Amino acid sequence: MTSNAAVTSVLASIWIAKQFPRDLAEVTTRMNQACSRLTLAQSATYAFPRGGTTVEGPSIRLAEALIGAWGNAEAGWKEVARHWDPKGADGKGCMVSECVAFCFDKETNVRREISFTVNHTRDKNEYEGGRKVMKRVALESERDVYELCANMASRRIRACILQVLPGWLTEEALEVVGRTLESGDKRSLPDMIRSMEAKFREYGVTRAQLEKNLGHGLEETTKPEIIRLGKVFNSIAEGLVRVKDVFPRDEQSQTKEPDIPSVSPASPSVPSPIVEDGIPGLDVPEDVPSFGSFEH
């Protein structure tokens, strides 16, 4: 698309948004409908320990649902440039993508952007002198590059969305999500406990580790504890936190801690990002996103 065509497309979408402004009553209704679905509620929040406290907040999945309910808005990311970094990949050199995550409310003309760079590298374990050494190697596949950039963009998109959306909408959504988690699951408590144990087992978490985290036998688990562990599971499944950070093994255990699986075998691992304080949604590591950009 040429620059003139792109400008025309943006102006047209803004004009349409002005002609059909959002109805806050409809926004609230759509938000309630989305957050009342158990599948969304179960993935709507994350929680993980950090510095002796628990970090908790809305996930990218909830942010997607809310910007959809808000309407007349667009959010996503784009790559704007690439350049060569001779110092990347442990001094061997690599390409670097310059990207922008954004959220644009076309009706109010409010736009938030976050620029970031992504080195085209991945971690690779190598053995030197009988010791395992972590090294950075350059990516060659365009698919790997795209997935890495999308991964790095995810929490920045969430941050942009949360800055554009009014705070009351996010707060009400979290309240609805909480009620859905409390009353939306009609299974018996023993069935919920067995399901929870099976899910954690996929990531190498044993029954003993769950019981140590809970402080009592698994059969004594309560509904609020299942909800809390569900948020922890979301954090582990999305790569926000490592299994061993939440469920440490005994020092005498000889069992190797399994790595958190990535989205696909070809997906590169992503380095832990630097915490960026002061911007909502930027206090957690990367999510695995499901989109490049979307409009509502």
Model-derived regions, located:
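Polyanion-binding surfaces on beta-sheet-dominated domains and ring/shell assemblies
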Residues: M1-S97, F102-D259
